[in-house]
Amino acid sequence: MDQGVIDYITNVFDIPKLAQPVSSVQMPLPLTRLAEIPLDSSVNQCQGFCYNSKKDVFVLACINADNTKQIIYEINPTTLQVVAKYEYSQKRLLGHMNTLTYNPNNNRYYTTNAVVDGYIVTPIEADSMIVEVPIKLKEKVFNFAYDKERNEYVSIVPLTNSHRTINYYDSNFNKIKTYKIDAEHTDLNNNGAYAANGNTIFTTLTTFVFIDDEGVVKNISSYTSGMEVEDMDYRNGQMYAAVNRNGKVEIYSLPTLPFSVNA
């Protein structure tokens, strides 16, 4: 999420007192750099990342500065070499491509526009890579993930510099519950989304935040400064993350997590 998306978040919320205490643990989280991904000259940053279990590829969504060009790269998860790419000029449908998630049940990626229309989630058929008709939600959506264990979707929406709303949707995109949590952060910037068995992970500019299925913040772990973790996903029991750092796009692994995630 960059400044253009932050500027687009215009809703003002009354923040209630949290019903449950935050149970966070501050500890550094090690990230191991695996590779730099070379980008085409028409794009300059990544915003979405996920794992396609059908193709066995990482999928990286990259954009240009004004959200008019998008490239989706497929990456071999072993060699970390680009094996395919798909180019778009779809500001109205794809826009910022803020987060990317894969639903293996219907073989579709989902991304959020976040700049032209902050209420839409756009599907992309994962074999043809055709962009489909957007899904309009009643709530704003910026960080979006599919929970395959529960066949649900999770959306993390910034409220203030510290507070976030976590919205949960069924497989037909009907909202089923909402939690408001304190990410203990001092910036509205919010990145990434991962969901598994009711648990949710997202990042701020400096931390990973883990929330359980009852809306309790179980862990907040810092990561190395000077990088921006944009999105993350699991493959074979290990988490991987796409990072913007010093004008480069890099893939990192997280060999251990300080909390249990069913992935």
Residue ranges, per PLM feature:
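Beta-propeller domains
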Residues: 8-30, 57-89
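A short beta-strand motif characteristic of beta-propeller blades
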Residues: 30-41, 81-91, 129-136, 174-185, ...
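Beta-strand-rich domains and repeat architectures in extracellular enzymes and scaffolds
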Residues: 37-68, 96-98
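Repeated scaffold domains used in trafficking and secretory/extracellular systems
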Residues: 42-50, 92-101, 136-149, 184-195, ...
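Short coil/turn segments that connect the beta-strands within blades of beta-propeller domains
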Residues: 54-56, 105-107, 149-151, 197-199, ...
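Structural motif
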Residues: 67-74, 117-123, 161-169, 205-212, ...
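Blade-loop segments of beta-propeller domains
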Residues: 80-108, 113
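Loop/turn-rich, solvent-exposed surfaces of beta-rich toroidal or solenoidal domains
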Residues: 182-211
